[in-house]
Amino acid sequence: VYDKSIPTVEAIQLFDDFLCELSKRKVQTFIISGNHDSAERMAFGGRLMKESGVYVAPVYAGKTQAVVLEDEWGSINIYLLPFVKPANVKRFFEDEQIENYTDAIRVAVEQMKLNTDERNVLVTHQFVTGAKRSESEDISVGGTDNVDASVFDEFDYVALGHIHGPQKIGRETVRYCGTPLKYSFSEIHHKKSVTIVEMKEKGNVEISTKELAPLRDWCEMKGTYMELTEKAYYENLDQDSYMHITLIDEEDIPEAVRKLQVIYPNLMKLDYDNQRTRGKAAFLEAAEVEEKTPFDIFEELYEKQNNQEMNEEQKKLIHDLVEKIWEGGH
């Protein structure tokens, strides 16, 4: 829901307005916490909100209770499974073999005791193997957060969160709807949309999408400063788009950001692509690697991907592996 565990006041107010509008329109709403959210904060007031048709998943405590809806074809059981790590599940099922994310979700699903004669829907927030990522999502080392899609086989529909690009995983009824807005320039080619799922009798699921048009789109441009500031170039562009501009001038343009923002007020990123920047990048990359040991390189990679340092046990393991490999070990 949010992009941090303690969201800004503005973000909370916006979400509150959104939920109030849905409730006014008698739209039943189902919410789970994601990997950026605080599950405890998200769950606050959940028991009160369900009286208004807003269902918030509680903090995972070893079981997932279905919300049962009724229509002319019978019951629809909606299960809300927030983002969980293997440790979150293992603490409740110490006798189960839980070594990775797939094991954790498999055990969590087994505890739901699905009635497969009825329609079952799962709302969850995990990275399912095979999904296409963008730069906006957190990535775990070596794909350790992967969940195999087979754990969802008994559900009639699985609504997934976490990946920003809309896509199906394996079958049509396991889907990421994606984010409603673009979050980085790596998503510039995404077609953002809302997924509409119509369920009739058991086994009859129709899926369609409604494309979303943002107030401001994202745009990338490349050229010389003179080219990009010519009226003939920009007069037919949406100048209010969020811009990433790459200048190819050999000399830096003084106060380029300030000058470009006169024409492109939502300039988000400015780069140069010329002989100097290409040479500097190549020199730095080669020099930095040559000066570092294999252990230093691995340690830096680990810190970048995990936002924390290795512990002493991990450091010793890597030291030993490096010594074996670089000193002729097998």
Question: Language-model features: where?
Answer:
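Conserved beta-sheet core of the metallophosphoesterase superfamily
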Residues: 50-51, 129, 134-203
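Conserved catalytic scaffold of divalent metal-dependent phosphoesterases
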Residues: 44-48, 52-145
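Active-site environment of divalent metal-dependent phosphoester hydrolases
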Residues: 2-6, 32-42, 62-65, 85-88, ...
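Accessory, non-catalytic peripheral segments of nucleic-acid enzymes
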Residues: 199-330
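Divalent metal-coordination and catalytic microenvironments
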Residues: 15, 34, 78, 125, ...
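Core catalytic region of metal-dependent phosphoesterases/phosphodiesterases
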Residues: 1-67, 151-155
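Short, conserved loop/helix-junction motifs that constitute active-site signature segments
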Residues: 23-25, 114-116, 150-154, 235-238, ...
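Binuclear metal-dependent phosphoesterase catalytic core
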Residues: 64-72, 76, 81, 174-239
